[in-house]
UniProtKB/Swiss-Prot annotation:
The gene is rpsH. It comes from Pelotomaculum thermopropionicum (strain DSM 13744 / JCM 10971 / SI). This is Small ribosomal subunit protein uS8. GO terms for molecular function: rRNA binding; structural constituent of ribosome. SUPFAM superfamilies: Ribosomal protein S8 (SSF56047). One of its GO terms (cellular component) is ribonucleoprotein complex.
Length: 132
């Protein structure tokens, strides 16, 4: 079966593993997925992420993060721009997630970055997802 939206599949794997308190989750790798995983790590939503070379496209392994009493660090994860309906934001329309408590991951002309960094650099682009 052909996968029409690999990024949505990646986010769903993370969401499902987070819901059932898994320690780690694996997904097929791509440049975009690596960039998203690194942003999640840098923003403190996941413990760590690593790339495993399997001779094909590779695998991304993400170690999920939980609080001391098993509270989820990732409360929500939502795909915004989909293959059937792309969502773009100009530099003055970059969204804030939960008043700045969450992040929007945006694909800009200078790479994939958070909404804060895009606003700081004065860039717009495709809104990939929201994480809170």
């Amino acid at each position: 079966m052909v996968m029409t939206d690999p990024i949505a599949d990646f986010l769903t794997r993370i969401r499902n593993a987070n819901t059932v308190y898994h320690e780690k989750v694996e997904a097929p790798a791509s440049k975009v997925k690596k960039a998203i995983a690194n942003i999640l790590k840098d923003e403190g939503f996941v413990k760590d992420c690593e790339f495993i070379d399997d001779g094909k496209q590779g695998i991304i392994r993400i170690y999920l993060k939980y609080g001391p009493n098993k509270e989820r660090v990732i409360t929500g994860l939502k795909r915004i721009s989909k293959p059937g309906l792309r969502v773009y934001a100009r530099k003055d329309q970059v969204p804030k997630v939960l008043g700045g408590l969450g992040i929007a991951i945006i694909s800009t002309s200078k790479g994939i970055m958070t909404d804060k960094k895009a606003r700081k650099e004065g860039l717009g682009g495709e809104v990939i997802c929201y994480v809170w």
